[in-house]
Amino acid sequence: VPDSAAKADRREQFAAWLTDTSNRQFAKNIANRIWKKMMGLGVVEPIDDFRDDNKPSNPELLEHLTDEILRLKFDMRELTRIIAYSSAFQRLAMVHDPSSAETYRFAGPVLRRMTAEQIWDSLITLVAYNPWSFQRPTAADIASVVDIDWSSANLAMAQTAADKYEATYAPGTYSKERQTLSGFEGQLLVRASEIPTPLPLGHFLRQFGQSDRESIEGGRTVATVPQILTMFNGPITHIMLKKGSVIYDNVVSAGPAQAVDVMFMAILTHRPTPLDRDLAVKEIRSANSVEAGYGNVLWALLNTREFLFIQ
């Protein structure tokens, strides 16, 4: 135990020992996890299997990352920023076969599918105007309901304010109201971080590999048939093609001349190539209605590998 924590309680002693600069093992684990989050592949894989006989693919890189996280006093946000500004991270994603005997040298990030949460949040931005609507009320929200001038308030006024707060922001009442305002066919259209977990097996997030929270590294990005069917014909796809969704309203208001650009920019974050534009316009014109044509193009873009994978 470091001398600085010699007289502290045991929890503080444990924390001090764990993060001490002489105990590099913990720092290596943290640095390796952040590297994998950014680059798609850890220097040590699996990331929760640090053993003497499981050698890092690049020992020098792991030691450098460990030195950095210790220098930064475990400031994970700063280490993330450093990696994000590196030329390795900013290169085009590379295809890597995990079963290959060849060591990956990190010429760039590994091409990988978005996590379940990333896919969900990407879709929600195309659907909901306020994806944060399920958050707890802010102090300003509560103040607008319980607005009392305590210099002149009496017991009756305080009781009225308390009743108003209970009717508006009591846990059960508030949660039910949020679900009513933000729900569609039993699914809350809010960011993944706002949804209580673990979710039922049939939910979009679980189908795409969200962790069941029963074990470390329980999340998966393995492709399955239900995932394909969900993207083809699931509730989230249906609501996106209806009036009132963000993408639908923006495409319709843009008009035929700009609609294709809006769809490509919103879903794939780039403008269409001349060939892409010709194919999209042809599909829109051949549909039963302009709106149906827009829906067909949106559906096609959502089901591309370009949308699902981080490049």
Task: Identify the residue ranges that each predicted region occupies.
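Primarily short, surface-exposed interaction patches in extracytoplasmic proteins
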Residues: 1-161, 214-218, 238-294, 301, ...
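Active-site-proximal alpha-helical
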Residues: 35, 227-235
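Long, His/Glu/Asp-enriched segments that create or flank divalent metal/ion-associated functional microenvironments
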Residues: 127-198, 203-209, 214-223, 229-230
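Residue-level micro-sites within transmembrane alpha helices that shape
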Residues: 226, 302-305
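Residue-level detector of short, conserved catalytic/binding motifs and their immediate flanks
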Residues: 226-227, 295
